[in-house]
Amino acid sequence: FLTMALAIFILSCENDGGTSNIPLNDGAAPNLIKSASTYGFFNLIRLNNGENVSIDFYAEVAQGNPAKTDIVGSYKTAGGLVYNTTLFGDVTLPQDFSLSINDIITVFSEINVASDIEVGDVLTITTRFTMNDGTVLNILNENGTSAVSSNIQTTVLFDSVISYPVSCPSDLGGTYNVV
């Protein structure tokens, strides 16, 4: 029995890495950071008062060596519609970026005026990388859901996606008694 087991073991290792080898491609992942100097959301009160509300963020390559990088946005309305566009095409990272409401109205053809922006809408920002071999790596699917595995989504090493909800902040200042 030992001789037969040894023979099978030796023969099975003879072609190790041959036809059973699964090729792995190198990928890339972004790191996106919201700026501390601007809101982490779109302030609908300021927007309704006619202000050109803006957001700032920083983007860098966390992993990999992409040949081309686009900063892309996915805008999901409170009603469930999803709009996708390239916010900044063929950029060099690392870099700081800024987007105003007027910029968003310009790049998303489905959003015509500032009043189209409502509470519950969310702008999600990430990257689309093109690798040297032509492979395109999308972090988001066309419907705005994640196109990457949970280990990329939940890593503590970098943020591959940042989201800016549309919100109405409230001032609940005062004195409260906790019982």
For the regions a protein language model found, what residue spans apply to each?
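C-terminal motif of bacterial Sec signal peptides marking the signal peptidase cleavage site
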Residues: 9-12
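Acidic/polar, low-complexity intrinsically disordered N-terminal segments immediately downstream
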Residues: 14-178
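Sec-dependent signal peptide recognition
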Residues: 1-3
